[in-house]
Amino acid sequence: MTQLDSRTEATTTRAFDQPRAEAAVRELLLAIGEDPDRGGLRDTPARVARAYREIFAGLYTDPDAVLNTMFDEDHDELVLIKEIPLYSTCEHHLVSFHGVAHVGYIPGRDGRVTGLSKIARLVDLYAKRPQVQERLTSQIADALVKRLGPRGVIVVVEAEHLCMAMRGVRKPGAVTTTSAVRGQFKTDAASRAEALDLILRK
């Protein structure tokens, strides 16, 4: 088991600690010189904690439970879902990044496919964690390989990082593109080119 797999497996056994999160937000407000007891901030620790519980919900969901439905369609060509919206959180600054994911796969020899909504849910699961875009892209691809046994998988993620837009270099509109290719898409240039052409075609 790789280090990445170990981290992914470990997160599925945790539970969100609401009181601890509220206390941490209160301490942060004090650290920046605010009064957490004033009217506008009195309920902020609880609200932020609830928001974090939702934003990081992917830490508490088993990927295998998402890809739990298969259909025997005897399909042996590319299945591609484009422009899946995603919202995630940069683990370096805990600031959002957002964009779209394009996910494609060629079913294995058994021709089994999964529901289209399952692919979107898988993207959400890995996006709703403290992340870096490179790892997010690879995790989606590897989960599909593990669960579907496809002949090939391709994942492309395009996202704008607010840690680059609202602070630091302050370059709003800059888009980062990452890709992960597995199986036939990695070994066969023609298959990869076909998929990328469909992904990039608007």
From Swiss-Prot:
Q: Tell me the protein's name.
A: GTP cyclohydrolase 1
Residue ranges of coiled coil: none
Q: Which PANTHER family match?
A: GTP CYCLOHYDROLASE 1 (PTHR11109:SF7), GTP CYCLOHYDROLASE I (PTHR11109)
**Organism per entry:** Mycobacterium marinum (strain ATCC BAA-535 / M)
* GO CC, alphabetical: cytoplasm
HAMAP family given in the database record: FolE
- NCBIfam families attached to this UniProt entry: folE, PRK09347.1-2, PRK09347.1-3
Please state what class of enzyme this protein is: hydrolase
UniProt keyword annotation of Hydrolase present: yes
Q: EC number(s) in its UniProt entry? A: 3.5.4.16
